[in-house]
Swiss-Prot record:
Belongs to the Smg family. This is Protein Smg homolog. It comes from Aliivibrio fischeri (strain MJ11) (Vibrio fischeri). InterPro entries: Smg.
């Protein structure tokens, strides 16, 4: 599913191509591009869920904390998000790319991927997609885009 999401993001969203394509035509295009039908459906559902996070009712249920609060992960989240990825999320909060609200959106979207092994690169793409979809996060999106395309980003302790 991650391949489909990255393809859609790079082809339509990131390249400023207008995405006024009917879902059926988009599905056909993705299938012709060689993606599996199940991955296509899951990716489109994932994008719909991401778009729903912009709704005020959905925002209300996302917990926000103060700048000194610490995120405690559930066991399911620990199982789905490895230590390196959790550390990267903390790093993004510390450098103000993510807020507690956008962090929660990222975690929710990562868990919706239903993947056994989330790579750091996949996490970076999810963060980028979330930030792209949240109004007022243009600066954070730009910073994340730089982090995504810079391979020598390291966490220093």
């Amino acid at each position: 599913m991650m391949d489909v999401l990255m393809y859609l993001f790079e082809t339509y969203i990131h390249s400023d191509v207008e995405l006024n394509v009917e879902q059926e035509k988009l599905e056909d295009e993705l299938l012709k591009a060689g993606f599996h039908q199940e991955a296509v459906y899951k990716a489109l559902d994932w994008l719909e869920d991401l778009a729903r996070l912009q709704d005020t009712d959905e925002h209300a249920r996302v917990a926000t904390g103060t700048s000194t609060s610490m995120r405690i992960y559930t066991q399911q989240e620990i199982d789905g998000i490895n230590t390196a990825c959790r550390g990267f999320l903390l790093f993004l909060e510390q450098i103000k790319v993510l807020t507690s609200e956008t962090r929660e959106m990222v975690i929710e979207q990562v868990m919706a991927l239903e993947t056994d092994e989330l790579s750091l690169d996949d996490l970076k793409w999810v963060v980028l997609m979330v930030l792209f979809n949240v109004p007022g996060q243009e600066s954070a999106y730009t910073q994340m885009e730089e982090l995504l395309y810079t391979s020598d980003v390291g966490l220093t302790h």
